[in-house]
Regions:
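Extended intrinsically disordered or low-complexity regions, especially N/C-terminal cytosolic tails and loops
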Residues: 1-215, 227-340
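Acidic/aromatic/glycine-rich contiguous surface patches that form carbohydrate-binding/processing clefts
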Residues: 223
Length: 340
């Protein structure tokens, strides 16, 4: 059998990069070390669709440029991973607070099916929530800490302990099947009682926004295609215009977001927006922007910064993020500081 993707030596991979894709390779040893550390598939597969001139050829760039673009991608992935974990913890804390205040701290009561919708937003309480959490509660291998510690030391497992062991996806599913009273309590905390959107709009933004953050977090954690990924359920930029001033650009009559913003909200920018929305202090929001800039520019002198700007411009094309991203972020911070 002639395989579609046969094994290629490093020398053969370099030849393909040079002959098929037109990548400029002046330092052969450097190119080989790049392929050893990154892999041919990650180097070309992750970037060629945006940078190519035609169906085959990338835009006459050097192997060094591809390498730097890959490092930038990984730096931004690490940044998103860091803040996705922060948002996950924040969300679980809010969920635990609302559920404990509504149903108490006895697991048999706060996980009683009568307290939840049977089915909502594609989520079944019994099949998608309870059955998953039950695996943690009945674990015999004592793998789930700190839940197992509470099983051994105390007479109950409060939700703020149990939720430390459930997955981000399970916590989102639990949110989906909350009844309106509890769901409204959650979104009022997350939106700081903002009345600029309807209840249904807030519910959808949290559901889709958190799902998108989880997806991008998983892509980064498992070394999957990150930059060019587009979500199936994008957040609606028009709904975010009031709560994230400066981050969404609208048409002159303010009836529709610009097309670039519609496209951006199907990619990585959707995760950036929701993370900023959920960070609940100006200090955290400012740190988020600072860390984002450091992920792109840190450790470089002025001359090298010009190269990083070019790299980031190409990265914005890959991700569909607005190229004036940092201008928008600083405008948002300025508005926030004036409000609070």
């Amino acid at each position: 059998m002639e395989y579609d993707k046969p094994f290629k030596t490093y020398d053969e991979q370099i030849k393909i990069l040079r002959d098929k894709y037109g990548v400029l390779i002046n330092d052969y040893d450097f190119a080989k070390n790049v392929l050893i550390s990154i892999s041919y598939n990650d180097l070309i597969g992750g970037f060629k669709n945006i940078l190519k001139k035609d169906s085959n050829s990338v835009n006459e760039i050097t192997i060094e440029y591809l390498y730097e673009l890959h490092l930038l991608d990984k730096s931004i992935q690490a940044f998103i991973l860091k803040y996705s974990l922060f948002v996950e913890n924040l969300f679980k804390n809010v969920m635990a607070y609302v559920i404990a205040s509504s149903f108490g701290v006895d697991v048999n009561k706060y996980l009683d099916a009568n307290n939840y919708q049977v089915y909502s937003a594609g989520t079944s309480f019994k099949e998608n929530v309870y059955s998953e959490i039950l695996l943690i509660l009945i674990d015999k291998k004592r793998e789930y800490q700190p839940t197992q510690y509470y099983v051994e030391k105390y007479n109950h497992i409060p939700p703020w302990i149990l939720f430390k062991n459930i997955s981000f996806g399970d916590s989102i599913n639990l949110y989906n099947v909350l009844k309106k009273e509890q769901k409204e309590m959650v979104i009022n905390i997350l939106f700081n009682n903002s009345n600029t959107m309807t209840y249904d709009q807030k519910v959808e933004i949290i559901r889709n926004g958190l799902t998108n953050i989880r997806i991008f977090r998983n892509l980064a954690a498992h070394n999957l295609s990150f930059a060019e990924f587009r979500v199936k359920k994008s957040i609606q930029p028009k709904q975010l215009y009031q709560v994230l001033p400066g981050l969404i650009y609208m048409t002159e009559d303010l009836t529709q977001p610009l097309n670039i913003d519609k496209k951006a909200c199907k990619g990585l920018y959707s995760a950036v927006l929701i993370i900023l929305l959920l960070l609940n202090t100006n200090e955290l929001k400012s740190l988020f922007v600072t860390d984002f800039m450091n992920a792109v520019f840190h450790g470089y002198n002025d001359e090298a910064d010009k190269q990083k700007i070019e790299l980031f411009t190409d990265y914005c094309k890959l991700t569909a993020m607005p190229k004036n991203l940092f201008e928008r972020l600083h405008k948002y911070l300025k508005v926030q500081n004036n409000i609070l």
